[in-house]
Curated annotation (Swiss-Prot):
InterPro entries: Ribosomal_uL6-like, Ribosomal_uL6-like_a/b-dom_sf, Ribosomal_uL6_a/b-dom, Ribosomal_uL6_bac-type. The gene is rplF. It comes from the Bacteria. The keyword Hydrolase does not apply. The lineage of its organism: Bacteria, Pseudomonadati, Thermodesulfobacteriota, Desulfovibrionia, Desulfovibrionales. GO terms for biological process: cytoplasmic translation. This is Large ribosomal subunit protein uL6. Belongs to the universal ribosomal protein uL6 family. GO terms for cellular component: cytosolic large ribosomal subunit. This protein binds to the 23S rRNA, and is important in its secondary structure. It is located near the subunit interface in the base of the L7/L12 stalk, and near the tRNA binding site of the peptidyltransferase center. Keywords: Ribonucleoprotein, Ribosomal protein, RNA-binding, rRNA-binding. It holds the Pfam family Ribosomal_L6.
Amino acid sequence: MSRIGKREIELPAGVSVELASDAVVVKGPKGQLSTPTHPKIAYAVADGKVQVSRTDDTRVARAQHGLRRTLLANLVEGVSKGFTKTLEVIGVGYKVATAGNTVSLAVGFSHPVDFKLPEGIEAKVEGNKLTLSGIDKVLLGETAARIRRVRPPEPFKGKGIKYENEVIRRKAGKSGGKK
């Protein structure tokens, strides 16, 4: 039995889970999210808790068991609390600004890079930090990764866009002497 899959999901106050034939819909104070169901996974809602179980013991069912439980737990947390991810822009002259649903990055190119945020993701800038927030953890992570990919941190000086708590492995520069 999957150690993650067999744990129950507690539903906070104001969060409801509806089971449809092809999706699980989670509604809460911050919005509504859904995830597709899998034919080998069964869901049961009772007493403010959701139990995820598998219909048989095949390899596919075992693989999906923990995954589907975690996806559902992320939806429950998203519609009740929401998620945030912070990126840091490090480098001389590197700047970040927001205008509506667009993030403008000046990160050493000859032009600023304008990044359009997907629906449901909000951005806030404080100095050199860009804080992204939203209710969908998967979409938030993808968006943060796409912004980081514009100028990933380089190992020599550490310049670029990095996650707030990311540790950059630094390399020594050229060490050859003059002849």
